Amino acid sequence: MKYIALFASLCLGAAASPVRERQTAQANISGFSASTSGAGNGASISFDVEIPDRVSTHCSYTDETSGSTLPTINQTPCDDESVIWQFKQDPSSPGSEGQYRIVIIHALESGAAEAGFHEWSASDFPLEEHTGSSDETVYAGASDFAVDMS
C-alpha cells in the first residue's frame, strides 16, 4: 500500500510539472547558388546562413570532378564550424526525378544541436544542354529562403 501511495504521489507530481516547449529558430539562407561547370569539370554551391542571435556564416563547396549533375555533399563545415550542412538529390521514382534537399545543423554551446532542411523539386535544378560543350546544371530557384530549425 505504501508503494501505491508513493507511486501515485510521483505521478501526480510529474503531471503537475510544466512541460517545456522546445525552442525553435529559423535559419535565414541568402545568396544560395548551385551549378556545375559548362566545361563539365566541376561544381559549386555557395550560400550564407544566419540564425538570429546565434550565428552568421558562409558555406561553400567546390570541386573539379563533377560532371553535369550536382554531387551529393556529405556533412561539410561552414566558415563557422558550429554549422555544418549536407546536400543531395533523392533517388528518382518512376516518372519523376528525385527532390533536392539541403540540411543545416547548428551545434549549440550546450552540446545539443538544432537542425532543419529545405527541399526543392528537380525542376529548380534544370539540366541545360549545350551543343558542342558539356551540359550543366544551374539552380534556377529563389536565392533567399528560410529553414525551420528544431
Regions found by a protein language model. Give the residues of each.
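Fungal secretory targeting signals
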Residues: 1-23
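A generic structural micro-environment signature
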Residues: 7, 16, 35-38, 55, ...
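Acidic, low-complexity intrinsically disordered segments
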Residues: 72-150
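Short, surface-exposed binding/anchoring microloops in extracellular/periplasmic proteins
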Residues: 19-74
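Conserved beta-strand elements of beta-rich interaction domains across eukaryotes
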Residues: 11, 52-54, 109
